């Protein structure tokens, strides 16, 4: 596998560098993080470059550039300090609707292409159904030609401001044999109550509880096929886990470079601290983890472009990168010392963000279970 960037990919990476150098984005990110606000102005700038169209097929006005290109862009954005976790719906969110949605649903979502605005997210997790997705209690019930949605969701990303949510629910008329179906829900409908939650990290993307009280839908609001809810979201889980891993790597690389620059200029005991062997040991271990993450992610991206990526690959990336990246950021914070914990350094934001990623998008434990099954399956 040759991971040298082609001309198109080099242009994207160069464009990212130019954008990130165009203004003090870090001040904007710090403000958005402090106020728990989605950085729409930044995402709009990326959309103007075509970043939200990287995976959209050419016949739908996209670039069809592939996952290796997505990886190159995400890695560079992260290295330069951008909160790529706010972009999870951009690479594949449009394609999900092109593949599964009705024409009306497709038109509503594709209208967001190029805008930088949040458009939709999935609502699966519930108070009693986290990793145990099969314990979902939210129901849809048909009555007098309408469909009524009842139940509660929690920890739903982007849901404070996104105009649409795809809700996983079980058929209320089939309690003994659960049928799980997704529904395309306009968040302005009566009966929906949203409660925004505070988070340790990833603050630029909202996290909410959502209650549905007899929310009236039509049959045309069904998303995909009835009873196919679980099968569809499995692919979405793999996609999300790969993107989370890319974000983890980029963030860790940024922290590593910040710490390296600091170590080479901070003087103690008459020498720069980078001359001390204990500090050098930290950088050696950080470099090993970063190199391992990068190679793993580029191989996974290549597999995705060639149609051979598996759920095991995605779980491996998510687990390893979430943990390795957190270790890198934690070590970088140790190098920075008081600057890292008492000042306004972005390392504190990185540390908070990466700790969340060992839970969100699938916990460490669920990634290990998924990966273990996938590994052994190859030898049956």
Curated annotation (Swiss-Prot):
Gene Ontology CC terms: cytoplasm
Enzyme class: oxidoreductase
Pathway(s) per entry: Amine and polyamine metabolism; carnitine metabolism
Annotated compartments: Cytoplasm
Primary residence: cytoplasm
Superkingdom of origin: Bacteria
Keyword Flavoprotein (UniProt): yes
EC number: 1.3.8.13
Cofactor(s) of this protein: FAD
Keywords assigned: Cytoplasm, FAD, Flavoprotein, Oxidoreductase
GO MF entry, a single one: acyl-CoA dehydrogenase activity
Assembly, per entry: Homotetramer.
Entry-linked HAMAP family: CaiA (MF_01052)
PANTHER family given in the database record: ACYL-COA DEHYDROGENASE, ISOVALERYL-COA DEHYDROGENASE, MITOCHONDRIAL-RELATED
Protein name: Crotonobetainyl-CoA reductase
Native source species: Citrobacter koseri (strain ATCC BAA-895 / CDC 4225-83 / SGSC4696)
Underlying gene: caiA
């Amino acid at each position: 596998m040759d991971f040298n960037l082609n001309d198109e990919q080099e242009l994207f990476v160069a464009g990212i560098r130019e954008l990130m150098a165009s203004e003090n984005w870090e001040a904007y990110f710090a403000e958005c993080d402090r106020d728990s606000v989605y950085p729409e102005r930044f995402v709009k700038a990326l959309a103007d470059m075509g970043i939200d169209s990287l995976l959209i097929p050419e016949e739908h006005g996209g670039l069809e550039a592939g996952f290796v290109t997505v990886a190159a862009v995400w890695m560079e954005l992260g290295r330069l300090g951008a909160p790529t976790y706010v972009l999870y719906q951009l690479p594949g969110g449009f394609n999900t609707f092109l593949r599964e949605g009705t024409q009306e649903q497709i038109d509503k979502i594709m209208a967001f292409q190029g805008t930088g605005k949040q458009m939709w997210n999935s609502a699966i997790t519930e108070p009693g159904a986290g990793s145990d997705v099969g314990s979902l209690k939210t129901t849809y019930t048909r009555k007098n030609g309408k469909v009524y949605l009842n139940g509660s969701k929690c920890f739903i990303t982007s849901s404070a401001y996104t105009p649409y949510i795809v809700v996983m629910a079980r058929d209320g008329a089939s309690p003994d044999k659960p049928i799980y179906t997704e529904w395309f829900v306009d968040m302005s409908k009566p009966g929906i109550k949203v409660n925004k939650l505070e988070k340790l990290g990833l603050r630029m993307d909202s996290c909410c509880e959502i209650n549905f009280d007899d929310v009236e839908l039509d049959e045309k609001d069904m998303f995909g096929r009835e009873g196919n809810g679980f099968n569809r979201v499995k692919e979405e889980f793999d996609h999300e886990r790969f993107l989370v891993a890319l974000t983890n790597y980029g963030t860790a690389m940024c922290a590593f470079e910040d710490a390296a620059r600091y170590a080479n200029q901070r003087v103690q005991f008459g020498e720069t601290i980078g001359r001390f062997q204990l500090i050098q040991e930290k950088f050696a271990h950080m470099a090993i983890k970063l190199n391992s993450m990068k190679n793993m992610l580029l191989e996974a991206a290549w597999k995705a472009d060639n149609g051979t990526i598996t759920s095991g690959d995605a779980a491996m990336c998510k687990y390893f990168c979430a943990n390795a990246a957190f270790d890198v950021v934690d070590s970088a914070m140790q190098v920075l010392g008081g600057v890292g914990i008492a000042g306004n350094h972005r390392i504190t934001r990185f540390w908070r963000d990466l700790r969340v990623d060992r839970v969100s998008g699938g916990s460490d434990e669920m990634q290990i279970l998924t990966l273990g099954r996938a590994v052994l399956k190859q030898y049956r």
